[in-house]
């Protein structure tokens, strides 16, 4: 009796197909790591309420030598997100300090205003992104290209590292001036496929009006934690340096979140 495999082989020979390929079992394609991560992040819908105490520390500097100007400070507040939207709350002491700095600065423009400037540094959309880091990551992954996947421990625990080529969004004017752009991202995944941490580095060089060269570098780092159906960025560091047209500057910031118990709504 002729077996099923033999019949398949004879059919392949008759059709001119590769008999080896016809006799070999089908091999399932390897899953795309980016698609796998996108699917895992899609399950983190950030639908449950969340409340966190946050602090933002910043340091900005522009110029060099005697013309260098530095400002630095730190502010703390509370952020919460629920079905009703996002709410940012500042303590009375923080607001009182900012008002006091404004009054003293009005009398003497040389008086620093670290608290007032710190309040201006904090953006509601950035806090929302910290409470829903999965959504932000999905947007970036949609434009990223996989470079490498390897096993690499993170904080002493087994983890898988994805190395990505990023595609930062540039406006038409920026695309005209930027001649070189290198953007690399790294994401460490835990055993459950959920991100533990991430890093990004963007280096751009260009020229304006053929004679004015410029260079900018952006470095960012995140630490994540899964809380219910949320991926929360418990820590985010951002460093930016730029130079051009005889000037240079640097901006550093670090945002830290401490999750708080969510108070259920009253009857």
Name each region found by the language model:
Residues 1-18:
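Sec-dependent N-terminal signal peptides
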Residues 181-203, 231-237:
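Extended soluble regions of mature proteins
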């Amino acid at each position: 009796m002729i077996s099923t495999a033999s019949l398949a082989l004879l059919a392949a020979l008759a059709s001119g197909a590769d008999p080896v390929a016809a006799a070999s079992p089908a091999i399932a394609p390897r899953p795309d790591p980016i698609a796998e991560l996108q699917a895992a992040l899609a399950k983190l819908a950030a639908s449950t309420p969340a409340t966190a105490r946050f602090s933002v520390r910043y340091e900005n500097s522009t110029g060099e030598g005697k013309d260098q100007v530095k400002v630095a400070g730190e502010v703390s507040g509370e952020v919460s997100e629920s079905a009703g939207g996002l709410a940012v709350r500042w303590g009375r002491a923080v607001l009182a300090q900012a008002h006091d700095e404004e009054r003293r600065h009005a009398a003497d423009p040389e008086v620093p205003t670290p608290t007032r400037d710190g309040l201006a540094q904090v953006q509601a959309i950035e806090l929302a992104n910290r409470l829903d880091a999965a959504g932000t990551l999905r947007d970036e992954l949609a434009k990223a290209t996989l470079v490498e996947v390897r096993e690499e421990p993170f904080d002493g625990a087994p983890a898988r590292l994805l190395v990505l080529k990023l595609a930062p969004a540039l406006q038409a004017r920026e695309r005209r001036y930027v001649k070189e752009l290198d953007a690399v991202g790294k994401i460490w995944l835990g055993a459950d496929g959920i991100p533990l941490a991430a890093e990004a580095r963007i280096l751009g060089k260009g020229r304006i009006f053929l004679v004015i060269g410029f260079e900018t570098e952006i470095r960012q780092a995140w630490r994540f934690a899964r809380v219910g159906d949320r991926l929360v960025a418990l820590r985010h560091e951002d460093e930016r340096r730029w130079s051009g047209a005889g000037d240079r500057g640097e901006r550093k910031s670090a945002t830290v979140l401490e999750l708080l118990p969510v108070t259920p709504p009253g009857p």
